[in-house]
Amino acid sequence: TGVMDGYQQATIHLGHDDEGDIVATFVRRDPSKLPMRARWRRQRFALRGHRLAVMYVHGWNDYFYRRHESEFWESLGIPFYAVDLRKFGRSLRDGQTPGYIEDLHDYAAEFNALRDLVVAEQGEQVRILLVAHSQGGLSSVLWLNSQRPHHVEAVALDSPWLELQGNRMFRILSTPVVQAFQLGGGKTVMPMRDPGFYGRCIDCETGGDWDYLRHPLVDPQRFFPRAGWMRAIYN
């Protein structure tokens, strides 16, 4: 998935695992292509000493493409930064298992790096609003709780996946099932069917609202729920 028109992206390296290099991708509007009003509002905030910024984290089987969110915040004079987490969207490399992770706390590397970039570009006085969707909401609050990151002063969660759907009994009964599947290896595919409602409701070709850059995957790379990933969610 390439960079969107009018945007810039940067890739950071996070190390490697058994599937190769691990990277994350940061995306933002190109400051030189912002509308004049947005640039003026940025300057006004800076002169008043009110430096604000937004960090955006996507959800499962997702990446950043929602231009309207960036354009809304930028129209107010507030810089907007998004991240494609490791093995999602622009950060997925050949041979990698899409979205796979065994410990959600590992995403702290991406979050810390993006926070540091925001502070470096916007100054030490910047106050950051963290906006996160679905699984990104869960990963984000784990980061906030464990690290108490500086400069992040507020959080807004969109449909956060903070707990499993269903009641407590569902978790009690399903936990041994997840553990049993993990005996076959963390990347064992879980027998969970995705009806595809989410994909259809966002894609303009199937009645949704957005015309976005698709990230085609061959069958071995499809976004199947894996036992190791599910265990990370349960933990």
Describe the role of every protein-language-model region:
Residues 60-61, 66, 89-126:
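Catalytic nucleophile-loop/oxyanion-hole region of alpha/beta-hydrolase
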Residues 71, 75, 120, 145-146:
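Short, well-ordered alpha-helices that flank and scaffold nucleotide-derived cofactor binding pockets
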